[in-house]
Amino acid sequence: MATPRTSSQERFAQFKLVLLGESFVGKSSLVTRFVKDEFLEQRESTIGAAFLTQTVSLEDNKTVRFEIWDTAGQERYKSLAPMYYRNANCAVVVYDITQASSLERSKAWVKELQHRAADGIIIGLAGNKLDLEDKREVPTEEARAYAEEAGLLFFETSALTGENVLELFTEIARKVPFENSTARPRMSAKGVDLNKNGGTEAQGCNC
Amino acid sequence: MEDGAKDDYIKDIYRHASPNADTDSFLGSPTVAIDSTLSTSNSLSNLNLDTNDSSSSPPAHNDDVPDIAEVLQEMLATTELPSSTTDLDYEPELDLVGGHRRNLGQLNDYGSPRADSFVSLDPPSIGTEVEQFLSKKKQFFILSSAGKPIYTLHGSDDVILGYLGVLQTVVSAYQADESGDNLMSFRAGKTLVVVAVEGPLILAAVSKIGESESQLRAQLDVLYTQILSTLTKNQIHRIYANQSNFDLRNLLQGTDVYLDALTREIVNGSPSILLGALEPLILRKSIREEIDGVLLSCRTPSLLYGLIVSDSKLANVIRPKKHSLHPPDLILLFSMLFNTTSFRDGEHWVPICLPKFNSTGFLYAYIHFFSKSSALIQISADKNAFFELREAKQQILSQMEDKGLIKALERAEERGRFKPVDVAVPMVRHFLYKSRAHVQYVMPSYETHYYEPHMQRGLLTFYHQLHAQVNSDSSRGSNNGWRFMHLVRNSCIGFAWITPSFELYCVSGPNVSRATLAASIHSIAKWVSQHRERLFVIGGAVF
């Protein structure tokens, strides 16, 4: 539910967002640019997942707070992904414009999200590393055509320069219906599915 | 090689019935000194390197095995390599290159792209890269039993693949002779090679800096623990049961930084890894108890362990009555947190196997750095517990803030270790004190005598020697666990005192009498005992 503030027209909503994509396409770098407006030249691979939050202000006095799961791209974490996208309102699937194979991996993620994530999930496709134009392998038009066909928002981004990063997240914030917003953080904490995979515990391997 | 027994190249080949035997049981193991007369080239061909699958090749004759071992360690021990103009004088080396390539042929059959790129280097160049590799004083190799590289400290694939092939062949030759033995270690001059076979993985450490076999074995165990923490023992066994030539690097992708961090610590002489113990944060007893109280009061149902760690030093731990935490697991976890930048921002939810707790399954760690160098770690068996633990974190931090405990932690961290003068033993420059009951160690700061990094490194090397000597087979007598060692060098004197409750290693300047040192060592033990509640995390808070 949207949780409108009491004051006149101000509206506040909180969305859960998950980042998916192959390893080394720059998911963590995109989030770091969005959340802290920083870029680390040497970044270590994410293991498991990192959880971050960031707020964006929209027109009409709307404020959106993102709760972001920045997931690890490695194959060994694949089986954990449903845990992160299960309750997500929106997702950013990232590929690297200099690696054609990473777009193929993105398509698989999109398919999985469309089949298994919540209905109405807003998916953005981000072709990252736009600053490496001279090494481009994925033509913009090809990716855009795919995105349109699959019903995705589409941006080419550069976490290094910051190009289109805020635009990507802002556009997603505009597209997610306010009614779909998760309730207050405290409530959402309880809302995480504790039953679906209950009892797997230490056996819940991520092979 | 007739005078091999006097020669540096004489080898002791240790063979052992149990692959996991600890050093204690080493006492009874047979030691075979081999005097080899075969040339290295012969020994290579004896090993059937050119068959398609050396691991399934017929068992090598026992008589030949030592020669292969000799070849391998000669390769590892050699620092001077033939220049290209003297190739003919170094036939054995050239033949090794041949072995190299044949072995690569196998790897190639398994479809490794890296092997592909290597084969095109024909012949493999013996140049500066190899020289650099061979000049390293310390090496670690992790490979699969099919000879596939998993991790190496030094050397690119081009350089190491041949060595790994030989190593794998030697190890499998021992396994193939039906005695159920595994190769444990061998020595060439000052170079010691220690091998650990862990299921489908082979780990090897090569040291030219005088570490003991048990020290190197402990180091290998730390690296193996890291690999298990990512994949679990079950997964590794399952993977190789399905596909014996699997390239494990695919699955370990991204974890090199953690293995690198551990090997860096090992190479730097980490006292924590030497002693297999944690360093606690020195904290007033009342502060530690207050923090324990906060952690306990905010505990949620899914919590298994809760820890607060400052700059790799354990400040607090809460745990269930039934379970204790295992220092090797924590050494690993702390190294991941504090020797890399991965976790510095935000909150993290990480599946991790703590192998000494349970090597077959995953736990989930909630990790959050609440200051520049202090982290809260909450470990749960429930993979869906993130938000529950996140909420607990918010309560823990706000309570700690209210009670001034975060500031107290910061102050403790700033104060750091105690100073040698605090202990009032003026002749002692530095010491390591390990409480065996708590599996924790304390030491004074390096300042005064060891402010330069190279001095610290020298000190730690000396501790390794002292530790090796006092824990060597010959000094492990009956004495009910009491041992004593006095080691005199030109520049310093070392003193080790092992009792059932503690291990104490101390270093003084030269020309200090034994009596003075003995008195000092008693003072240290007494001082530590008096301050134990401030120095150590005693048991942690139990729920």
Curated annotation (Swiss-Prot), chain B:
Organism listed in the record: Yarrowia lipolytica (strain CLIB 122 / E 150)
GO biological process, any: protein targeting to vacuole
Cellular compartments per GO CC: fungal-type vacuole membrane; Mon1-Ccz1 complex; multivesicular body membrane
Function: In complex with YALI0F03861p/CCZ1, is required for multiple vacuole delivery pathways including the cytoplasm to vacuole transport (Cvt), autophagy, pexophagy and endocytosis. The MON1-CCZ1 complex acts at the fusion of vesicles with the vacuole, through its regulation of the SNARE complex during the coordinated priming and docking stages of fusion, and particularly at the stage of tethering/docking.
Chief location: membrane
UniProt record similarity statement: Belongs to the MON1/SAND family.
Keywords in alphabetical order: Autophagy, Endosome, Membrane, Protein transport, Transport, Vacuole
Name of protein: Vacuolar fusion protein MON1
Subcellular location: Endosome, Multivesicular body membrane; Prevacuolar compartment membrane; Vacuole membrane
Domain of life per record: Eukaryota
Matches recorded under InterPro entries: FUZ/MON1/HPS1_longin_1, FUZ/MON1/HPS1_longin_2, FUZ/MON1/HPS1_longin_3, Mon1
Membrane topology: Peripheral membrane protein
Compositional bias of kind Low complexity: 41-57
Keyword Ligase: no
Pfam (any one): Fuz_longin_3
Region feature (Disordered): 41-65
